[in-house]
From Swiss-Prot:
<keyword id="KW-0479">Metal-binding</keyword>
<keyword id="KW-0378">Hydrolase</keyword>
<keyword id="KW-0028">Amino-acid biosynthesis</keyword>
<comment type="similarity">
    <text>Belongs to the peptidase M20A family. ArgE subfamily.</text>
</comment>
<dbReference type="InterPro" id="IPR050072">
    <property type="entry name" value="Peptidase_M20A"/>
</dbReference>
<dbReference type="GO" id="GO:0008270">
    <property type="term" value="F:zinc ion binding"/>
</dbReference>
<protein>
    <recommendedName>
        <fullName>Acetylornithine deacetylase</fullName>
        <ecNumber>3.5.1.16</ecNumber>
    </recommendedName>
</protein>
<feature type="active site">
    <location>
        <position position="144"/>
    </location>
</feature>
<dbReference type="InterPro" id="IPR002933">
    <property type="entry name" value="Peptidase_M20"/>
</dbReference>
<feature type="binding site">
    <location>
        <position position="80"/>
    </location>
    <ligand>
        <name>Zn(2+) 1</name>
    </ligand>
</feature>
<feature type="binding site">
    <location>
        <position position="169"/>
    </location>
    <ligand>
        <name>Zn(2+) 1</name>
    </ligand>
</feature>
<dbReference type="GO" id="GO:0005737">
    <property type="term" value="C:cytoplasm"/>
</dbReference>
<dbReference type="InterPro" id="IPR010169">
    <property type="entry name" value="AcOrn-deacetyl"/>
</dbReference>
<dbReference type="InterPro" id="IPR001261">
    <property type="entry name" value="ArgE/DapE_CS"/>
</dbReference>
<comment type="function">
    <text>Catalyzes the hydrolysis of the amide bond of N(2)-acetylated L-amino acids. Cleaves the acetyl group from N-acetyl-L-ornithine to form L-ornithine, an intermediate in L-arginine biosynthesis pathway, and a branchpoint in the synthesis of polyamines.</text>
</comment>
<feature type="binding site">
    <location>
        <position position="145"/>
    </location>
    <ligand>
        <name>Zn(2+) 2</name>
    </ligand>
</feature>
<comment type="subunit">
    <text>Homodimer.</text>
</comment>
């Protein structure tokens, strides 16, 4: 029942007070089970059917799908339940206590993006869900901040095919219809150590890596020449060499060298295509030094994403907001949800607050976000 639902600010406060940090380091990583239980209970109180889905390969992480209404199509509102870790020394407030000051709501996850669920729940007070002509789905995912395992697994396993979806990441209520992807790899070269006084008796991994880097930089130039998407501020795929390490002493032939690099592909470029281009670029080194060079993923890859600019979802949201859709360089779960239905990224708060100490969401977003959620539910589930 709606009267069992706490006030908006108390929902928000409870979400922020429930830690759900995602981290690759096991000591920092936390289950989101308590947060999922909170959300599940609230949506059940509103009459939703709730399914909780364990996410394989994670440390006790879960997705939640709340659904109401019958038939095909409908609207999916999605978001992630986890946050990044926090630097205790840089926060001036308790990250897990929602505090309001000077028109801002402070706390870990206020903008990115636990708050979106508080907005959805509050908006549902003013909607008679018994009169929906199409179903409404609420998806809460796990591990977005690390592997995006929750959204990946949900997209792979669900039979759900809504008419459209909105992911409530902090976009300052500016609709986003496309973003680049992200691929990160480790290039590892195994040489053969030896005394530096006799270089011919070893294989210097740093020298081989120097050769490999030359070919990788040629690939970077080729990507810039071949692929363009003018709507992006950087309108081509970027390739960055981010970290390198090799050797242990000046008088030893280097036996191992490791390079970490990333590529941010444009929408429409497939991961197989990019991996093929990288393998082709490194082929001369591999042929010359068989068995000495390997390429390994550092993190699961994220493809680029694009919602067709002429889709009804884009037209409706642009009309409701009086704003054109944008493209951005950061990544979200949209590529995975987009495999189910056309998807936009749109939510309250600024992306500039994501992953920052003293994270906050400005209270000026409260009223327009609530109104927008009501409007999109009316449009896609009542008509």
């Amino acid at each position: 029942m709606k009267n069992k639902l706490p006030p908006f600010i108390e929902i928000y406060r409870a979400l922020i007070a429930t830690p759900s940090i995602s981290a690759t380091e096991e000591a920092l990583d936390q289950s989101n089970a308590d947060l999922i239980t909170l959300l599940a209970d609230w949506f059940k109180d509103l009459g939703f059917n709730v399914e909780v889905q364990p996410v394989p390969g994670t440390r006790n992480k879960f997705n939640m799908l709340a659904s109401i209404g019958q038939g095909a199509g409908g609207l999916l509102l999605a978001g992630h339940t986890d946050t990044v870790p926090f630097d205790d020394g840089r926060w001036t407030r308790d990250p897990f206590t929602l505090t309001e000051h000077d028109g801002k709501l402070y706390g870990l996850g206020t903008a990115d993006m636990k708050g979106f669920f508080a907005f959805i729940l509050d908006a549902l007070r003013d909607i008679d869900v018994t009169k929906l002509k199409k179903p409404l789905y609420i998806l809460a995912t796990a591990d977005e901040e690390t592997s995006m395992a929750g959204a990946r697994y949900f997209a792979e396993t669900t039979a759900l095919r809504p008419d459209c979806a909105i992911i409530g990441e902090p976009t300052s209520l500016q609709p986003v219809r496309a973003h680049k992807g992200h691929i990160s790899n480790a290039i590892r070269i195994q040489g053969q150590s030896g005394h530096s006084s006799d270089p011919a008796r070893g294989v210097n991994a740093i020298e081989l890596m120097h050769d490999a880097i030359g070919h990788i930089l040629q690939l970077r130039d080729n990507l810039k020449e071949r692929y363009h998407y003018e709507a992006f501020t950087v309108p081509y795929p970027t390739l960055n060499l981010g970290h390198i390490h090799g050797g242990d002493a000046s008088n030893r032939i280097c036996a191992c060298c490791e390079l970490h690099m990333d590529i941010r592909p444009l929408p429409g470029m497939t991961l197989n295509e990019l991996n093929g281009l990288l393998n082709d670029a490194l082929a001369p080194v591999i042929e010359r030094w068989p068995g000495r060079l390997t390429v390994d993923e550092l993190h699961p890859p994220i493809p680029g994403y694009e919602c067709p600019p002429n889709h009804q979802l884009v037209e409706v949201v642009e009309k409701l907001l009086g704003a054109k859709t944008e493209v951005v360089n950061y990544c979200t779960e949209a590529p995975f949800i987009q495999t189910l239905c056309p998807t936009l990224v749109l939510g309250p708060g600024s992306i500039n607050q994501a992953h920052q100490p003293d994270e906050y969401l400005e209270t000026r977003f409260i009223k327009p976000t609530r109104e927008l959620i009501i409007q999109v539910i009316h449009h896609f589930c009542w008509h």
